[in-house]
Curated annotation (Swiss-Prot):
GO molecular function, one term: GTP binding
Top-level lineage group: Bacteria
Residues annotated for Zn(2+) binding in this entry: 111, 114, 182
Record EC number: 3.5.4.16
Record-given protein name: GTP cyclohydrolase 1
Associated pathway: Cofactor biosynthesis; 7,8-dihydroneopterin triphosphate biosynthesis; 7,8-dihydroneopterin triphosphate from GTP: step 1/1
Alphabetized UniProt keyword annotations: GTP-binding, Hydrolase, Metal-binding, Nucleotide-binding, One-carbon metabolism, Zinc
Catalytic reaction annotation: GTP + H2O = 7,8-dihydroneopterin 3'-triphosphate + formate + H(+)
One GO term (biological process): tetrahydrobiopterin biosynthetic process
A Pfam family annotated for this UniProt entry: GTP_cyclohydroI
Length: 223
């Protein structure tokens, strides 16, 4: 019989979840961003003091506030649904019927297990069923879902599901190739490895269509 803490240590980097949503509490937005920053600032101060750091030193006395603002306003800003980009779509007046691929979208996210960076590229494609979306909106959707504590599998699914909803079609695909600093800089410390995840919907489940998409992106990510 192991306790819950031992269990969490045992599963380590194993990824499991009941759905594609981030695990947020119901009261996640009961306080303002400014209140969150103040609370996190005090928590970071406590961590640094516990580590023995001198918070009167000019180099780090502003660190708690910087970290708190970074968490709330920047790297975890995608947790706030008020910041979700508007996925405007338009009629496919050109009657373009082939797949559209947006390659090499920059991914900056954060591993929710160790709060270390995930850095990589996303490749997203869809086949229009009558609606099209602005190219930059695809980048913004990737950025929005990346700016939160994440696992790469969930991020890949969220991007596809958001585009499926916006475009009114199942014919959406996403591949992400990313480095996880929780693997590269700690633990096994394998600086060469990267993680590839994929999600294929609708016509992209067809082997020929999937092959066409993969040929377009020619996965060889440069980090």
């Amino acid at each position: 019989m192991i306790n819950n803490e031992d269990f969490l240590d045992e599963i380590g980097d194993s990824h499991f979840s009941s759905n594609a949503k981030n695990p947020l509490r119901e009261d996640a937005f009961d306080i303002t961003d400014e209140e969150k920053i103040e609370k996190i600032k005090k928590d970071v101060e406590n961590i640094l003091q516990t580590l023995g750091m001198d918070l009167t030193d000019d180099s780090i006395k502003g660190t708690p506030n910087r970290v708190a603002k970074m968490f709330v306003k920047e790297i975890f800003g995608g947790l706030n649904p008020a910041k979700q980009p508007k996925a405007s779509t338009f009629d496919n007046n050109y009657k373009y019927g082939e797949m559209l691929v947006e390659k090499n979208i920059t991914v900056y996210s954060t591993c929710e297990h160790h709060l270390l960076p995930i850095i990589g590229r996303a490749h997203v494609a869809y086949i229009s069923s009558g609606r099209v979306i602005g190219l930059s909106k695809m980048n913004r959707i990737v950025e929005y879902y990346a700016k939160r504590p994440q696992v790469q599998e969930r991020l890949t699914m969220q991007i596809v599901q958001e585009l499926q909803k916006a475009l009114g079609t199942e014919d959406v695909a996403c591949v992400i190739d990313a480095k996880h600093l929780c693997v590269n800089s700690r633990g096994i410390k394998d600086i060469e490895s990267s993680t590839v995840t994929s999600e294929f919907g609708g016509k992209f489940k067809d082997p020929q269509t999937k092959r066409e998409f993969l040929d377009y992106i020619k996965l060889d990510t440069q980090f």
